[in-house]
Amino acid sequence: MLEQMGKAAKQASWQLAVLSTAKKNQVLSVIADKLEAESEVILQANEQDMEQARASGMSEALLDRLLLTPARLAAIANDVRQVCRLNDPVGHVLDGSLLDSGLKLERRRVPLGVIGVIYEARPNVTIDVASLCLKTGNAVILRGGKETHHTNQATVKVIQQALEQCGLPAAAVQAIESPDRALVNELLRLDRYVDMLIPRGGAGLHKLCREQSTIPVITGGIGVCHTYVDDSVDFDKALTVIENAKIQRPSACNSLETLLVNRNIAAEFLPALSSKMAVVGVTLHAAENAMPMLQDGPATVVAVAAEDYDDEWLSLDLNVALVDDIDQAIDHIRTHGTSHSDAILTRSLSSAEHFVRAVDSSAVYVNASTRFTDGGQFGLGAEVAVSTQKLHARGPMGLDALTTYKWIGYGDDLVRS
């Protein structure tokens, strides 16, 4: 089955690679229109998935990721239209030169070919990934989790109808519908057809892909994100940033999970933090050194467990620990971080610069919320993933990350001497 899908995707990718930008934008516009026209069907399919997820005891954090609402679906359709407005990187000449031999050489962006994406309870990923792949002339094979089975079926059907309406093969966007996990292992070895694999899920999925795939893998998306509060901060401004990073969307991979506070301000800052978090319903998981200043505050507080520092809460929970200085904060991030998004709140330029240089994450912020790590916020349009590795993409992966380049040489019946 996957052999046939891979072959069809590869053949479709050859057609996509030579499409004009106007034609690709036409396809995306039709997809956006059809998402709105078929919204009732898609939302009904999503409700089937939600009912099954609730019955299985899925956590509130994951239920929120799975849920599609009319507003969320409309936003997804608008994201597709935003991709239409983005510059098409395909065909862009990165650099060029005229060599002594007379050969005119240029390096030009081209599609990767066929992308494989494995993801879990995130129905928006189907549309986000498909739109970015189509804009860059790539075919895609999607393998969503069983939690999103009905939603993915409905959305992929809409995309394939749009492709055929525009005279393009439906095989440009395909989904593996069977929940059989053996098919994941088969996909990981489909290197004859698939050029890059992107897993979007938990640590177990990432480990499986790294160990078993014969296809280049881009991993990321696991976000144990930190914010360090320096002793020079304005309390009110710092608390506003912390609140945004934690509660705007707790289930997102760029939400704040661990707060590191400079010991010099702890006696004043932690009670203020407790008051702020109590209002928004955040439970504080306090380190032993922070507990005395939090236990009598209005926020719910429990003792942090050692393993809490290494896991995503994805909920209204926040680890809080005191550090002696910026270097101890950096050491903590190096030990427990996932190279996703980390921030410093400070009024010291030297501290800010030291933090930026020393913290080796895909996104590092000074006096800003970690919630900004997002393709839309970065001006990249919808993102295919957030890469926490260094090759070949890092951070939110927009259009450029779905391309490679080829060398093109022009001569006048030129031969090498």
Swiss-Prot record:
PANTHER family: DELTA-1-PYRROLINE-5-CARBOXYLATE SYNTHASE, GLUTAMATE SEMIALDEHYDE DEHYDROGENASE. Its main location: cytoplasm. This is Gamma-glutamyl phosphate reductase. It catalyses: L-glutamate 5-semialdehyde + phosphate + NADP(+) = L-glutamyl 5-phosphate + NADPH + H(+). It holds the Pfam family Aldedh. One of its GO terms (biological process) is L-proline biosynthetic process. Catalyzes the NADPH-dependent reduction of L-glutamate 5-phosphate into L-glutamate 5-semialdehyde and phosphate. The product spontaneously undergoes cyclization to form 1-pyrroline-5-carboxylate. It comes from the Bacteria. Its EC number is 1.2.1.41. Belongs to the gamma-glutamyl phosphate reductase family. It comes from Serratia proteamaculans (strain 568). One of its GO terms (molecular function) is NADP binding. PROSITE patterns: PROA (PS01223).
